[in-house]
């Protein structure tokens, strides 16, 4: 009979003890600060895009269309430049996700290769603990995080939103008066209300069937906030163009008329 505890990580041995190989070799690592350990359960294993170049190109196309959307919003351009930058910083993730959904961008991931503990120990240089100045590699996206992202996109596809509905929804997300540091927060709040009213008019909420649709749209849109922007950058952009401030990139693209 198995002695493992319920919920114990299968990456470890019986009774949640580390694997034998790790126990035998860990003594050589005691003098070296170890990075945060990673669970190797399937849902938490790191993954990477199967077609990074194609997917990154499609993601950049979505950013370009997002810039085009912002350029066609006089109410956005009339805001103070500092507020424009803060709104981009606070909402580029949900706007990008709406663009992925609207363009029906699909992608597949595969498990990323993970160096074995033995390989890490054998390749570890003694001088590395003496302050080489190199930071450990940032963890790659997990399978669970990517699957949740795909689930959110599929929820939008099931709604079959029209281009006008997508545009109204983007407006409700863009004009967020709760973003810290806004100079015109009150005015931005009014813009958000206007975008919400237009969305309601487009969905015709006085129709009983449309009322349920409006609720589903708003609930689905609320899930976008659960997707961290770090996941979007690490999954769609970092493999090809490296670490990039996407909000800053959008701001630069807006200046290129």
UniProtKB/Swiss-Prot annotation:
Keywords: Biological rhythms, Cytoplasm, Disease variant, Methylation, Nucleus, Obesity, Receptor, Repressor, Transcription, Transcription regulation
A GO CC term attached to the entry: protein-containing complex
Modified-residue entries (Symmetric dimethylarginine), positions: 57
Record InterPro entries: NHR-like_dom_sf (IPR035500), NR0B1/2 (IPR033544), Nucl_hrmn_rcpt_lig-bd (IPR000536), Nuclear_hrmn_rcpt (IPR001723)
Keyword Repressor: yes
Superkingdom field: Eukaryota
Involvement in disease: Obesity: A condition characterized by an increase of body weight beyond the limitation of skeletal and physical requirements, as the result of excessive accumulation of body fat.
Subcellular location: Nucleus; Cytoplasm
Role this protein plays: Transcriptional regulator that acts as a negative regulator of receptor-dependent signaling pathways. Specifically inhibits transactivation of the nuclear receptor with which it interacts. Inhibits transcriptional activity of NEUROD1 on E-box-containing promoter by interfering with the coactivation function of the p300/CBP-mediated transcription complex for NEUROD1. Essential component of the liver circadian clock which via its interaction with NR1D1 and RORG regulates NPAS2-mediated hepatic lipid metabolism. Regulates the circadian expression of cytochrome P450 (CYP) enzymes.
Family: Belongs to the nuclear hormone receptor family. NR0 subfamily.
A Pfam family that the UniProt record links to this protein: Hormone_recep
Domain NR LBD: 16-257
Organism expressing this protein natively: Homo sapiens (Human)
Gene of this entry: NR0B2
Post-translational modification as stated in the protein's UniProt record: Arginine methylation by PRMT5 enhances repression activity of metabolic genes in liver in response to bile acid signaling, by increasing interaction with cofactors.
One example of a Gene Ontology biological process annotation: negative regulation of DNA-binding transcription factor activity
PROSITE patterns: NR_LBD (PS51843)
Protein name (Swiss-Prot/TrEMBL): Nuclear receptor subfamily 0 group B member 2
